Amino acid sequence: MTQDEMKKAAGWAALEYVEAGSIVGVGTGSTVNHFIDALATMKNEIKGAVSSSVASTEKLKELGIEVFDCNDVAGLDVYVDGADEINGKNEMIKGGGAALTREKIVAAISDKFICIVDDTKQVDVLGQFPLPVEVIPMARSYVARELVKLGGDPAYREGVITDNGNVILDVHGMKITDAKDLEDKINALPGVVTVGLFAHRGADVLLVGAPEGVKKFD
């Protein structure tokens, strides 16, 4: 199986967690795009979706799936999203696609988080993939200096503005052994909107597309 075929297998496997009559939380990225294709086969059985990005919203609407505003729902049964890295505790680095804040919000209102990845995303220690931090523009330099104090090497993601109008710092060179503690420390910095560590709200179920098929961890 190619990497894209493994992503597709994981995306379609997540369909079993979608219940008829529900509103589904939908994440962002190449693996999620396969899930959206799968979800379209159930579009007449579900009420619709809450999306974590403009890109996913556009794809959902193109396929005829109604998209609800996050503020108009009290909660979601399930949220399906990918990850840039995930460890054995189902803690993740997310935000390579710059949608981390909205992803974290949709995850927070969902009862169950289904993470879908190919097997290249599984790691023992988080941090080889640069850790994204969404920052209010005027705080960029200050936050970068503070991230250096925390042991990171931050780089401004030039030319990228988030759906919320903010900028991204990608933090290189970190071996994250205590993800919850680092999530707290970075989120406490003035000017940080959120960090792409999903440790306090990790995945409940992990579906991994692998050469031998889809593996499930929960």
Curated annotation (Swiss-Prot):
InterPro entries xref list: NagB/RpiA_transferase-like (IPR037171), Ribose5P_isomerase_typA_subgr (IPR020672), Ribose5P_isomerase_type_A (IPR004788)
GO BP annotations, alphabetical order: D-ribose metabolic process; pentose-phosphate shunt, non-oxidative branch
Active site: residue positions: E103 (proton acceptor)
Gene Ontology molecular-function annotations: ribose-5-phosphate isomerase activity
Assigned keywords, A-Z: Isomerase
EC number in record: 5.3.1.6
Signal peptide per UniProt: none
Main EC class the enzyme belongs to: isomerase
Binding locations of substrate: T28, G29, S30, T31, D81, G82, A83, D84, K94, G95, G96, G97, K121
Function: Catalyzes the reversible conversion of ribose-5-phosphate to ribulose 5-phosphate.
Protein name, UniProt field: Ribose-5-phosphate isomerase A
